Amino acid sequence: MELLVVIAIIGILIGMFLPAMQQVRESARKTQCLNRLRQIGLATALFHDSHEAFPPARLYPKKDASFELRFFVGDQPSWLVRILPFMEQQAFYNQWDLSEPYTTQPDETVNQSLASFVCPSRRTIDNAVAPDRTEGIEVTSPCGCGGFVEIRVVGGATGDYAGNHGDLSPGSIGAATDYYYGGNGTGVIISSQARKDSDSKLTWLNRISYVDIPDGSSNTALAGELHVAPENLNTTPFNGPMYNGEELAAFARVGGPGVPLLGKSDPLSSQVLGFGSWHPGACNFVFADGSTRAIDNRTDTVTLGQICNRHDGSTPIIQ
């Protein structure tokens, strides 16, 4: 009888302490996530010091760009590759050719995950790769015959952090002013038009620096956790290869009216544009001044848009 009582007491104690232990562990993971965002923020600031501008999210033309600029259609490596030297990853950076398409980079390079780019509440680097896949493309031959050909779509390492591309105020309706075209983003890490210097070195045209953040670097997000539902982890377009400039949602997100912060189990699991986390009730961000904050998921979308827009003239009240 006494043994049964002891077992019952032990069971009660375990039931009492297990939730507390889980909360402590999640708190530690959330802090680690903030530290990783802080590292990304520092690396981006060092990039700014070196280049007098923040890194472009990707190289991407305007809708009405010249033929020469249209050649650069976003398939060069993303901004996460550009900041590698400032994260003590010079050797990894040296494996990349920023002037060449992502699909031509070595497989071992595009598949290399980094712990600094994953949230510990969501996964480890062992679960941070989107596999290659095949897609059927409809083609028409010279004889007028139709058919399909299968092409290989290159996968690669995935991550949990995305640059702040701004809000949707420029539009997202297929117009030339849409946010995803080069130079149109209202955030800090935005798609930029490519250009070549006199020595034919590939660089970017739309350069965002601290002077281009009139709302203040402490009021404007630099990067944050990207939303992805558990069932969409490591799948395109929800959580595709983060180094691939064609996969904008894999490394840059927007926030504001129409694009709220989302949690792990929110019903809008198909949302591919916005920020969100698997931490209970909050999403972690690093701001342009290097500070980190956990923003309440209940933050209204107007305030979120003010946080994401670098020049809307507002001062957001952040919960």
PLM segments and residue spans:
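N-terminal single-pass transmembrane signal-anchor helix
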Residues: M1-R29, Q39
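Surface-exposed loop/linker segments characteristic of extracytoplasmic
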Residues: I12, S27-Q319
